[in-house]
């Protein structure tokens, strides 16, 4: 064994061994308990960033630990390879998205291998290959036949100059990112999957997910947004149709003083034909973004349509306004407004001078003061005719019943959740497998024409999708009749909704899934990824699993038992102000800093001498130029060091502050372990451990070893507090470094301890542990070694520490047998010189003894 720790030599050698031995390839084995450990698959952007490294290190630690417990562990990896960034990069680099993507995959695959992640590479998938997306296309056609897929018009961002649809992120301040033309909202036909048909089950089954973070479950509950209310029908004077609104507060119905409809509602459109102000407003709304965050903060505007609706219970006429806070996509595109008891309605009514009628009493039974704001709390009704005096529930039921009796109201359960629009007017995605015949009939692509292959050898102009630009591509025939293919592609969330299941059978050619393999491995035991995926990906992931279950492919109801959301990786951020007042962000690697005595940064400059402004720690990002390249760190310190720092610096679900001093600390620790093993093995063969022959000190050290094994096992396995597990191993290492190494049993004990330490560190630092295990004479590869088991006998305390006080002041501590009597403890205390001097020439008047803990001698 060489004296110096040289990661660059060890790591490549061990990685080659894993590759040649195919160490992490697994197959179904009914005789073993399975464990499926999955990290969210990466987008092949070109380089790994520290967020990836953190995510995949956590996954690898869990997978290696479970493997050492003797389980059959599947840990696969693949590439979420379709998506918009590839189109932008292709235009910029004058290439096509496919070669750019495949080059990135090759580069990043090598980076993953360099970090020593134990993946089953035989199961690698790239979602942009026809071998993968053909099954997604087939499944979509089956969902269509089941009535779970439909087409309807929906609003998109449209650039009139480029004549193209833009993704939300391509709209900058309301303008096209390429040509700066003002973006319009345009209605185009798009494909949808009926996720709403599963809303109740998606909501209900959240209760089964005991090992998912509550924050994620709450976000999904709110996103699905189940509510119980009443759908009410209003007649409108001079308008051919009725208006239907939904409310969760029918108790406030007698306070409804106006209705509001979306600018896109047929009533508003009709009224706008003879109303220039309204027509201009409808036009303005058409080009407004409808992201929910913006809806909440934007100014509420409206125009009176001139129509009057009839209140179904009072017969009063109430105005109908067009308002920008009502969306056609949500509900019926019309809402009833009760300004006395809803803050948004109150602000709108105050702005436009509409009637505000209170119908709920304040908590103290008085009429509410509505001079400043609405009263939104529930309470007792007044000003409501026959319903006066009723509290919320009674009023809800009485008014709902009355409306139903008159045929103008119906109790309804509503959801905020909207059906999933899966059409994208982009090129780099899986083609949607639908065709339109000459007579307008829409059909799913026949099975013998699947997969519909996306051509990869294309020229990108950055404006129009190559498959839309090439009229020949869309031409096909069905039953000998000409037809046109759909030129939209799938939302890339489609691919990431079922990849986890395909990993169980990536070579299977008979269908989407091999049920036998899928049901052996599924559900996923732990799924690791960022909380930013809480509603979109993680909801579609759950939805797709239920679709596959209902198609008879899987038997479980949910795709993953446990979800672990890792925290973000933060780094210092610095900038200097340029000549034009712009901020120039400087990489923390290039910042020369001065710190105060507490280690805080007080001054910074860069190599060019610019005074830098330090903005604190923030998420590593391109925009702040504060990303640290994992590759540079691996080259400098080795993969094991980077992995150890990642797992030690912070709990897995909390933010991690990147500090190179911490990386250096992790590196020093690995060197200490190496040095101790080197010194130990250099002394030659070791005798067998004879537990019965150990001295008290040796027993105490062995107790520490086995208590550490018990703690680390609990920290990694049950608590998943990986940082405290590492801290416990470090603490034990400090004791081992100080332990005597001369006697035969000293060395035998150190041998047992080091073999335990190396196995406990193996999930975190697998390369160095692989090597040290061999040096310590471990059996076989450490990858197949069992996890150390704590010896219960060794952990039994046969002595205990008793604090000795004289007149209530601590004067010493003594070690006594666990079963020592009070007399024996007193006798032992008298022999302790620190205590004895306080007992010299005095009389012990009283003895207070707390067995095994405290002896207090009262003297006078």
Swiss-Prot record:
GO molecular function: aminoacyl-tRNA deacylase activity; ATP binding; leucine-tRNA ligase activity
SUPFAM superfamilies according to UniProt: Anticodon-binding domain of a subclass of class I aminoacyl-tRNA synthetases, Nucleotidylyl transferase, ValRS/IleRS/LeuRS editing domain
Domain of life according to the entry: Bacteria
Enzyme Commission identifier(s): 6.1.1.4
Record's subcellular location: Cytoplasm
Main location group: cytoplasm
A biological process from GO: leucyl-tRNA aminoacylation
Pfam families assigned: Anticodon_1, tRNA-synt_1, tRNA-synt_1_2, tRNA-synt_1g
Protein name, as recorded: Leucine--tRNA ligase
GO cellular component terms, semicolon-separated: cytosol
Motif 'HIGH' region boundaries: 42-52
Keyword ATP-binding listed: yes
Binding-site list for ATP: 622
Reaction it catalyzes: tRNA(Leu) + L-leucine + ATP = L-leucyl-tRNA(Leu) + AMP + diphosphate
Short motif 'KMSKS' region, span: 619-623
Keywords in alphabetical order: Aminoacyl-tRNA synthetase, ATP-binding, Cytoplasm, Ligase, Nucleotide-binding, Protein biosynthesis
Family designation: Belongs to the class-I aminoacyl-tRNA synthetase family.
């Amino acid at each position: 064994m060489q004296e110096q720790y040289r990661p660059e030599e060890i790591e490549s050698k061990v990685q080659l061994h894993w590759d040649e031995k195919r160490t992490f390839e697994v197959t179904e084995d009914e005789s073993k308990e399975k464990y499926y450990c999955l990290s969210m698959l990466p987008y092949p952007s070109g380089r790994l960033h520290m967020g990836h490294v953190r995510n995949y290190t956590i996954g690898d630690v869990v997978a290696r630990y479970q493997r050492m417990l003797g389980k059959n562990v599947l840990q696969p990896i693949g590439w979420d390879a379709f998506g918009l960034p590839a189109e932008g990069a292709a235009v910029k680099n004058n290439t096509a998205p496919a070669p750019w993507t495949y080059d990135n995959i090759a580069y990043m695959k090598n980076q993953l291998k360099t970090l020593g992640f134990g993946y089953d590479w035989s199961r690698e998938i790239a979602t942009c290959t026809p071998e993968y997306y053909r099954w997604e296309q087939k499944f979509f056609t089956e969902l269509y036949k089941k009535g779970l897929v439909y087409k309807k018009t929906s609003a998109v961002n449209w650039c009139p100059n480029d004549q193209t649809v833009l993704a939300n992120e391509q709209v900058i301040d309301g303008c096209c990112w390429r040509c700066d033309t003002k973006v319009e909202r345009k209605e185009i036909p798009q494909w949808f999957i009926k996720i709403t048909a599963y809303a109740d089950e998606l909501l209900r089954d959240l209760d089964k997910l005991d090992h998912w973070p509550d924050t994620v479950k709450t976000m999904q509950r709110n996103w699905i947004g189940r509510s119980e209310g009443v759908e009410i029908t209003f007649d409108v004077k001079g308008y051919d149709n009725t208006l239907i609104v939904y409310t969760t507060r029918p108790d406030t119905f007698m306070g409804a003083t106006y209705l509001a409809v979306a600018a896109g509602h047929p009533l508003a459109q009709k009224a706008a034909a003879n109303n220039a102000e309204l027509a201009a407003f409808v036009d303005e709304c058409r080009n407004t973004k409808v992201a929910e965050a913006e809806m909440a903060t934007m100014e509420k505007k409206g125009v009176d349509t001139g129509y009057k609706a009839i209140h179904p219970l009072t017969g009063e006429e109430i105005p109908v306004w067009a308002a920008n806070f009502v969306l056609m996509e949500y509900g019926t595109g019309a809402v009833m407004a009760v300004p006395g008891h809803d803050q948004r309605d109150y602000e709108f009514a105050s702005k436009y001078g509409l009637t505000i009628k209170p119908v709920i009493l304040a908590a103290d039974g008085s009429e509410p003061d509505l001079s400043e704001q609405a009263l939104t709390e529930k309470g007792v009704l007044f000003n409501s005719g026959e319903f006066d005096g009723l509290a919320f529930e009674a009023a809800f039921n009485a008014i709902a019943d009355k409306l139903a009796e008159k045929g103008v109201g119906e109790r309804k359960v509503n959801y905020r959740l909207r059906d999933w629009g899966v059409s994208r007017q982009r090129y780099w995605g899986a083609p949607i497998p639908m065709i339109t015949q000459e007579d307008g009939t829409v059909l799913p692509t026949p099975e013998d024409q699947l997969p519909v292959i996306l051509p990869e050898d294309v020229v990108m102009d950055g404006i129009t999708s190559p498959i839309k630009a090439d009229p020949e591509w869309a031409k096909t025939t069905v039953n000998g009749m000409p037809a046109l293919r759909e030129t939209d592609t799938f939302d890339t969330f489609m691919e990431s909704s079922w990849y986890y299941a395909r990993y169980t059978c990536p070579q299977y050619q008979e269908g989407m899934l091999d049920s036998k393999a899928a049901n052996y491995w599924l559900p996923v035991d732990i799924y690791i990824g960022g909380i930013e995926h809480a509603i979109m990906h993680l909801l579609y992931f759950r939805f797709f699993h239920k679709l596959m279950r209902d198609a008879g492919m899987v038997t479980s109801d949910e795709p993953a038992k446990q979800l672990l959301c890792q925290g973000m990786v933060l780094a210092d951020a610095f900038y200097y102000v340029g000549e034009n007042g712009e901020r120039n962000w400087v990489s923390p690697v290039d910042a020369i800093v001065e710190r105060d005595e507490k280690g805080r940064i007080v001054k910074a400059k860069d190599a060019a001498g610019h005074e830098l402004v330090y903005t604190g720690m923030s998420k590593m990002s391109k925009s702040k130029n504060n990303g640290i390249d994992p590759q540079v760190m691996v080259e400098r310190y080795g993969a094991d060091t980077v992995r150890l720092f990642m797992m030690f610096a912070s709990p897995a679900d909390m933010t991690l502050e990147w500090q190179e001093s911490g990386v250096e600390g992790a590196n020093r620790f690995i060197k200490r372990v190496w040095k101790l093993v080197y010194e130990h093995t250099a002394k030659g063969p070791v005798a067998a451990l004879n537990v019965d022959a150990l001295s008290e000190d040796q027993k105490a050290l062995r107790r520490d070893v086995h208590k550490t094994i018990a703690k680390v096992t609990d920290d990694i396995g049950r608590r998943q507090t990986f940082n405290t597990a590492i801290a416990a191993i470090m603490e034990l290492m400090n004791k081992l470094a100080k332990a005597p190494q001369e006697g035969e049993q000293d060395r035998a004990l150190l041998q047992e301890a080091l073999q335990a330490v190396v196995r406990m560190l193996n999930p975190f630092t697998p390369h160095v542990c692989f090597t040290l295990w061999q040096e310590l004479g471990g059996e076989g590869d450490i990858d197949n070694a069992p996890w150390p088991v704590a010896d219960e006998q060794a952990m039994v305390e046969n002595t205990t520490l008793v604090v000795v006080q004289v007149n209530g002041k601590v004067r010493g501590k003594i070690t006594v047998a666990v079963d020592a009597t009070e007399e024996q403890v007193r006798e032992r205390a008298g022999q302790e010189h620190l205590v004895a001097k306080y007992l010299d020439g005095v009389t012990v008047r009283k003895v207070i003894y707390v067995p095994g803990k405290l002896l207090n001698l009262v003297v006078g």
